[in-house]
Amino acid sequence: MRKLFVFILLLLAVAVSAQTDKAFMTVDWGKIKAEVEANPQRVQQLVDILINVDADTTLTAKDKILAVYGRTYLNNGRDLLMEFDMSKARNEGKFDKAAAIADKVLASNPLNTNAIVSKIYNFRILVDKEPDKSWMLSDSLKVYSVRLSRILDTIFMTGDGSKEYPFSVTAVGDEYNLLQFFLGIFKVNGQSVVGTCDRLVLGETNKNYSSPDIYFDVKRVFEIEKSMFNSQGGDGK
């Protein structure tokens, strides 16, 4: 899979280099939730533009943040259980099965980064197995790679990875996908919860990210997981 990592990193290199010495926009969850409740159709329209490989240039940074983070209030984690099954299949090396489940996950939440990665994994394998179809598969691979790039670029806008300004995520998978496919960091030596943040201790650094640890704001992740637990009959305590 290292070849795949290198492939995607090449696609994302321009996005990373363009954000050197960036300014960032922290996520105002209360404001985003209010905007979703007031106009859910607009949020969905922004999502549709974001995932359209030919249309994203019309979106401002604020629009992208509203799309990526507002979408969670439209879906409320309904894709989470399917994502568990998908990740299990992928970890077992059943990439075709994972890709099939990923289609269902993306039908529920088109911004699920783990599902997008599962599709990319499978397309990359098929390109090697079926070279006569590589032109068609490469087009599909590009579509999902661009979508992943846009989502991760939006996450990257929300902080600098410090405890004071953590990157905001809506799923744990976003953390590792940002590390691997956007920052090019593959080694993590440890993880801990610090307040409402996940802190990852890194086993390597590079020119894209030089700090020894990285923080992610997981407030929304906790809310989604609690909501799912309650819907499954838990007491939420």
Residue ranges and their predicted role:
Residues M1-F24:
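Bacterial Sec-dependent N-terminal signal peptides
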Residues M136-N177:
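Long, positively charged binding patches that form subdomain-scale interaction surfaces
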Residues L4, L9-L12, F123, I224-K226, ...:
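Residues in flexible loops and secondary-structure boundaries
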Residues Q19-A99, K163-K237:
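N-terminal alpha-helical interaction modules that lie
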Residues V6, A34-Q41, I51-A55, A107, ...:
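Generic surface-pattern signal
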Residues A61-D153:
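Alpha-helical protein-protein interaction scaffolds
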Residues L4-F5, L141, Q191-V194:
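Residue-level detector of intrinsically disordered/flexible regions characterized by low predicted structural confidence
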